[in-house]
């Protein structure tokens, strides 16, 4: 009896396809315990997405935690020998705090880890598997890559104080050029250095073209080395890497990743469905001299693909209008100017008219 995949949810379909993909590439399934000793997460807290975990005292008196991360457990037990590369894949649930609900939630992850002798070829093979994982979803997807060495090299070249970096990185993650520049100047950087930081936000686009643009902005060897590694990756991927994007402003989880990082997106899903990269520093805490790279797919996000469209997207041929309530004063003027600059200006200036509502029928935008 044959079972059609179409009868399963998007997440279930992905599970079947990814399992076949990973096992075909030589990865062995890792089965993690639901609980780990809390001491593991306490010691490696800075490598976790969030320091909050659910703990309990087990029957043997030990303090344990409901697993918030799979990679730590694999890194602890892998212990690859010198020159050996161990490859694992997993299909597990982790428990983490939700920023939206401010409660703990279970997150269904499926991913893989390559640990030990990770060279340029192994790194390219993992990125190729990430691209194939996205392609297995049968929907439009895109993979963005970056390199932590380019960003940290710039911060070092500009002599940004360690205590000031967290604030600057927050604005960089938020893609807020104005606040990033202001914070850089407040830190004591000059206009040229501030411009170099905000310039990171412009280093985003097709991999090849953005590499060329980034080379012209390099200030140190660390940045040039990072770009060379990305060039080697592009060459190794060849046609498989077509459509890959480069975003050198990517600054997520810098405590965790130390080199290549990548993020996958799916059309119709607002958050990333895939995250991964190099985490050599973490791996070397368990096995000196070893390197590691891996990624995880967030299968819960895929269920959005099966959710019905919101009413505004079910209107057939009718136009969907964007209604914007502008605040009074300079804040409203600034917001309108930004929107107008993006092509959403009204047919008449809302400041010069007595009308309470102005609109642009072509852009389907209305201001109050």
Predicted regions and their residues:
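Positively charged, Gly/Ser-enriched RNA/tRNA-binding surfaces
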Residues: 7-25, 36-37, 69-82, 86-140, ...
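Beta-rich nucleic-acid/ligand-interaction surfaces
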Residues: 32-51, 146-156, 250-259
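Acidic, His- and aromatic-enriched active-site or binding-groove loops in soluble protein domains
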Residues: 51-58, 160-182, 189, 266
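TRNA-binding/sensing appendages of the translation machinery
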Residues: 1-67, 124, 128, 355
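Short, basic, glycine/proline-bearing loop/turn elements
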Residues: 1-4, 216-219, 268, 357-364
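Short secondary-structure junctions
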Residues: 27-32, 243-244, 342-349
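Short internal beta-strands
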Residues: 142-146, 325
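N-terminal hydrophobic or amphipathic helices and topogenic motifs
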Residues: 316-368
